[in-house]
Amino acid sequence: MSRYLTQLDDELCWFPDPEHALEEPNGLLAIGGDLSPARLLAAYHKGIFPWNEPHQPLLWWSPDPRGVIRPEQLHIGRTLRKFIRGTSFDISIDRAFNEVIAACAAPRRSASGTWISTPMIDAYRQLHRLGHAHSIEIWQEGQLQAGLYGLSLGRVFCGESMFSRIDNGAKLAMVALCQHFARHDGALIDCQMQNDFLATLGIEEWPRRQFLTTLAQLSRQPLAANCWQTGSILL
């Protein structure tokens, strides 16, 4: 199949087949468009997500291979288990979405900023208000210390970003997501791409075609009705 970069129409929420994505940079498929809820949902349902540096135009990606985690197969190492047993924390869902995405967008120790621009923040906050985007929060003594956010598509959760102000906080947020999602019939977490952090948690790399086929099936299947009800999570 031929590979090319597509310029998106500003009005039509359409995307090309992800199999046309470039090999280098891996998965770059399209440029332009906007971050409207309709376009974002159309993208995620096709296995496409936006990512660009603040100085770049809006770019859309569908990498091959695709990083995924099956919730019931999350790897919890000995050190993490000890941390979970020995640390006092509270875990919640959708209690502080705005604060989580703002923390994810804040500069990191190793970089001057992140890819999460103000338009990105506004777009995902709108998806949250519409019931599509959700967050997991880790609290200690009433202070938000870690969390993650992403989109729910049926039995698939598309993870977007996470942050942590404490050791193992981001891993704890992932454990909470996987256990909660699995208990409510969730089947797959899309992590987009492999990295060293996710490798410690048991991420798998699937060929893009396998991921897209599975996404098409699972995104049409319902979760338990109360999966994303605001409240607390128990591990």
Swiss-Prot record:
Q: Which SUPFAM superfamilies match?
A: Acyl-CoA N-acyltransferases (Nat)
Work out whether the entry's keyword set contains Magnesium: no
Query: Looking at the UniProt record for this protein, which Gene Ontology cellular component terms does it annotate, in alphabetical order?
Result: cytoplasm
- Enzyme Commission code(s) on record: 2.3.2.6
Q: Where in the cell is it found?
A: Cytoplasm
Pfam hit, one? Leu_Phe_trans
- Gene3D superfamilies named among the record's database cross-references: Leucyl/phenylalanyl-tRNA-protein transferase, C-terminal domain (3.40.630.70), Leucyl/phenylalanyl-tRNA-protein transferase, N-terminal domain (3.30.70.3550)
Which reaction is catalysed here? N-terminal L-lysyl-[protein] + L-leucyl-tRNA(Leu) = N-terminal L-leucyl-L-lysyl-[protein] + tRNA(Leu) + H(+); N-terminal L-arginyl-[protein] + L-leucyl-tRNA(Leu) = N-terminal L-leucyl-L-arginyl-[protein] + tRNA(Leu) + H(+); L-phenylalanyl-tRNA(Phe) + an N-terminal L-alpha-aminoacyl-[protein] = an N-terminal L-phenylalanyl-L-alpha-aminoacyl-[protein] + tRNA(Phe)
Q: Which GO terms are recorded in the biological process aspect for this UniProt protein?
A: protein catabolic process
Tell me the keywords, alphabetical order.
Acyltransferase, Cytoplasm, Transferase
> What broad class describes the main subcellular location of this protein?
cytoplasm
Q: Which of the seven top EC classes does this enzyme belong to?
A: transferase
What GO molecular function terms would the record report? leucyl-tRNA--protein transferase activity
Functional summary from the UniProt entry:
Functions in the N-end rule pathway of protein degradation where it conjugates Leu, Phe and, less efficiently, Met from aminoacyl-tRNAs to the N-termini of proteins containing an N-terminal arginine or lysine.
Family membership noted in the UniProt record: Belongs to the L/F-transferase family.
Q: What is the name attached to this protein's record?
A: Leucyl/phenylalanyl-tRNA--protein transferase
Origin species:
Aeromonas hydrophila subsp. hydrophila (strain ATCC 7966 / DSM 30187 / BCRC 13018 / CCUG 14551 / JCM 1027 / KCTC 2358 / NCIMB 9240 / NCTC 8049)
